[in-house]
């Protein structure tokens, strides 16, 4: 498999400029884990199915990833971590491919990154992702 990531939407490139967003080997980077890498490439192959109003749920459906709509209160084993890994990857995939994210998807992606921070600790790469998601404009779900 090629080590190059799928070309990013200009809005993604402008906002998510830290090296982790182009790092295919860092397990804590959005596309560095096997799950993140596979999800990005699976969805990129069907990119024409993503409209300007595509949602996080659309990305999860295209990738055929079965995650719960809610986090629930009592995770079983590592279920929260596994779901959070897929949700974070899906959120960043949507942003990378379309330059936008739906408000509900934005919140779920932030929640997923927070779960990963709880699981792995306050690693700088995860803190960077959270900060970048927090600063993503929410008035409009699309940047230029």
Model-derived regions, located:
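Alpha-solenoid helical-repeat scaffolds
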Residues: 6, 30-33, 49, 53, ...
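Short terminal alpha-helical segments
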Residues: 2-57
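Acidic, Ser/Thr- and Gly/Pro-rich intrinsically disordered linkers and low-complexity segments
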Residues: 57-81
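Catalytic toxin/effector domains delivered as secreted proteins or via bacterial secretion systems
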Residues: 39-47, 65, 96, 107
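Amphipathic alpha-helical elements of HEAT/ARM-like alpha-solenoid repeat scaffolds that form extended
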Residues: 24, 81-97, 130-134
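Long protein-protein interaction modules used by eukaryotic assembly/scaffold proteins
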Residues: 72-76, 81, 90-121
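Short loop/turn hinge sites at secondary-structure boundaries
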Residues: 46-53, 62, 98, 144
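Eukaryote-biased recognition of C-terminal alpha-helical segments
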Residues: 113-144
């Amino acid at each position: 498999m090629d080590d190059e990531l799928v070309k990013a939407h200009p809005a993604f490139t402008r906002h998510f400029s830290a090296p982790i967003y182009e790092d295919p080997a860092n397990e804590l980077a959005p596309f560095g884990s096997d799950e993140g890498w596979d999800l990005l490439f699976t969805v990129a192959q069907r990119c024409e199915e993503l409209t300007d109003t595509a949602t996080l749920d659309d990305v999860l459906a295209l990738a055929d990833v079965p995650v719960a709509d809610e986090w629930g209160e009592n995770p079983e084993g590592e279920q929260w971590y596994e779901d959070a890994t897929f949700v974070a990857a899906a959120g960043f995939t949507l942003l990378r491919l379309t330059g936008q994210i739906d408000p509900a998807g934005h919140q779920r992606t932030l929640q997923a990154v927070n779960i990963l921070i709880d699981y792995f600790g306050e690693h700088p790469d995860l803190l960077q992702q959270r900060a970048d998601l927090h600063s993503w404009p929410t008035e409009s779900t699309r940047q230029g």
